[in-house]
């Protein structure tokens, strides 16, 4: 098939690789423009653009797809289908209609649950035990289109947004290849009206740990915000990101370190096993404790 691929972050890269490996003809890759990054704040291409250039594919970086010039250029590609994975730009109706078979989106949730920008974070933070990927025929609404194919996976007790992100990316890559091979046989199923929830974008204000909350809530917050933006607390006057945890037994003052890095909460405790100190990389909590001088009885803020 002649495919237009639209994607930007790391999540999208395995999907592009899978389409190329399946010997589809990727006629163009659309990705958001390079952005300043790193200490030097030099423009850096998106992960998708970097991978596409390695593969020798044509890359386009429009700031918007609203102009008639951009829409005409896309239509002139005469694509059979567009595959859209975390692209980040709104697709006008003219773009949705341009490919012969329309635009297919890979969405990282079991629609209609968690429509929107942050479905992986929200699933973990809500305590969901199942999630998955949907291949959806795109329409004008936000993740409202009929679903062609669904693939499920369980959310484990130790899953973070990082681990689930990688797993769902791989599932999505296989699912879109399967969907394209069965496109004539698959029947798009409208999403039900019941069970709609929205995965709003994560706000950095959600990352500060409130030790008055119950342990299960704090544990889900830590796992759901790991690795980015990272739930955090103050320890010894410095910000400490909390990256991995589990619910534990124990009682004490709110935010009190009971032993190791097991911390008392509003109800129960959480055992934190991986952290990222301010200005440093991620490390095991036990290694951080060796130099942090955080003794039992210390209160995290």
Curated annotation (Swiss-Prot):
Report the GO molecular function annotations: methionyl-tRNA formyltransferase activity
Which Pfam families does the UniProt entry name for this protein? Formyl_trans_C, Formyl_trans_N
Has the keyword Magnesium been applied to this entry?
A: no
> Entry's PROSITE patterns?
GART (PS00373)
Give the enzyme's EC designation. Answer: 2.1.2.9
Sites where the protein binds (6S)-5,6,7,8-tetrahydrofolate: 109-112
Per its UniProt record, what CDD domains does this chain match?
FMT_core_Met-tRNA-FMT_N, Met_tRNA_FMT_C
Keywords attached to this Swiss-Prot or TrEMBL record, sorted alphabetically, are: Protein biosynthesis, Transferase
Q: Which reaction does it catalyse?
A: L-methionyl-tRNA(fMet) + (6R)-10-formyltetrahydrofolate = N-formyl-L-methionyl-tRNA(fMet) + (6S)-5,6,7,8-tetrahydrofolate + H(+)
Report the GO terms under cellular component: cytosol
Which family does the entry's similarity section mention?
Belongs to the Fmt family.
Q: What does this protein do?
A: Attaches a formyl group to the free amino group of methionyl-tRNA(fMet). The formyl group appears to play a dual role in the initiator identity of N-formylmethionyl-tRNA by promoting its recognition by IF2 and preventing the misappropriation of this tRNA by the elongation apparatus.
HAMAP family reported for this sequence: Formyl_trans (MF_00182)
What name does the UniProt record give this protein?
Methionyl-tRNA formyltransferase
Q: Which organism is it from?
A: Jannaschia sp. (strain CCS1)
Which gene is transcribed and translated to give this protein? Answer: fmt
């Amino acid at each position: 098939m002649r495919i237009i691929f639209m994607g930007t972050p790391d999540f999208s890269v395995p999907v592009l690789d899978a389409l190329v490996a399946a010997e589809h003809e990727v006629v163009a890759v659309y990705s958001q423009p390079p952005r300043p990054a790193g200490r030097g704040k030099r423009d850096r291409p998106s992960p998708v653009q970097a991978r596409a250039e390695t593969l020798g594919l044509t890359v386009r970086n429009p700031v918007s797809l609203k102009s008639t010039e951009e829409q005409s250029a896309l239509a002139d590609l005469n694509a059979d289908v567009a595959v859209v994975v975390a692209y980040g730009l709104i697709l006008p109706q003219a773009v949705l209609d341009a490919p012969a078979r329309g635009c297919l989106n890979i969405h990282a949730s079991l629609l209609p649950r968690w429509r929107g920008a942050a479905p992986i974070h929200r699933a973990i933070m809500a305590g969901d035990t199942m999630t998955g990927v949907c291949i959806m025929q795109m329409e004008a609404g936000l993740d409202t289109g009929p679903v062609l194919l669904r693939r499920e996976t369980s959310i484990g007790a130790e899953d973070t947004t990082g681990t689930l992100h990688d797993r769902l990316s791989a599932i999505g890559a296989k699912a879109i290849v399967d969907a394209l091979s069965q496109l004539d046989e698959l029947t798009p199923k409208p999403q039900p009206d019941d069970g709609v929830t929205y995965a709003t974008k994560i706000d950095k204000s959600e990352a500060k740990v409130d030790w008055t909350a119950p342990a299960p809530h704090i544990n889900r917050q830590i796992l759901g915000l790991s690795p980015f933006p990272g739930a955090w607390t103050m320890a010894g006057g410095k910000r400490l990101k909390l990256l991995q945890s589990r619910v534990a037994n124990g009682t004490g003052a709110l935010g009190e370190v009971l032993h190791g890095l097991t911390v008392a909460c509003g109800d129960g405790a959480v055992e934190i096993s991986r952290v990222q100190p301010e200005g440093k990389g991620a490390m095991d909590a036990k290694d951080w404790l060796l130099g942090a001088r955080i003794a039992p009885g210390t209160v995290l803020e």
